[in-house]
Amino acid sequence: MRAFIVGRWQPFHKGHLEIIKKISEEVDEIIIGIGSCQRSHTLTDPFTAGERIMMITKALGRYNINYYIIPINDIDFNAVWVSCVESLTPPFDTVYTGNSLVRELFSEKNYVVKKPELYNRKEYSGTEIRKKMLKGEKWEHFVPEEVVDVILEIDGIGRIKRLDEKDYDDYF
């Protein structure tokens, strides 16, 4: 059996890792969708699709998990989004999501949709991790060490801080 899960993975953290590991116990292969793959260089989505692929690939390298990583664009046309996903991915039977819109769209196309059990959601939140990065607080223990390495390699902290700078135009 093959399953699909989509996320923004901004950044890929230990909560995400635990969900992927749990799903891998239930299916033979996982298709990991890089959602909003066209978005990057914002405070909400600071990392590129390629950087997120590096994070996930390196973090999963030590586990015996069969997976594909597929970039998924936002198309702002919800009625056909599932068809777009299907055209980009290998076939799959089951969708794992905690997102109500994704659940609805795949349910309407008769997919089996499961809600993954979130792993310590209060502690493992991409939003909170990005806030900690911005404030100069400790964030490294929330992500796999391989993700720390990628973020340091690409100067992800510097990028987030530069994105938060107020432009001169903002004052007028």
Swiss-Prot record:
Keywords: ATP-binding, Cytoplasm, NAD, Nucleotide-binding, Nucleotidyltransferase, Pyridine nucleotide biosynthesis, Transferase. It is found in: Cytoplasm. GO terms for molecular function: ATP binding; nicotinamide-nucleotide adenylyltransferase activity. This is Nicotinamide-nucleotide adenylyltransferase. It comes from the Archaea. One of its GO terms (cellular component) is cytoplasm. It holds the Pfam family CTP_transf_like. Belongs to the archaeal NMN adenylyltransferase family. Pathway: Cofactor biosynthesis; NAD(+) biosynthesis; NAD(+) from nicotinamide D-ribonucleotide: step 1/1. GO terms for biological process: NAD biosynthetic process. Its main location: cytoplasm. Its EC number is 2.7.7.1. It catalyses: beta-nicotinamide D-ribonucleotide + ATP + H(+) = diphosphate + NAD(+).
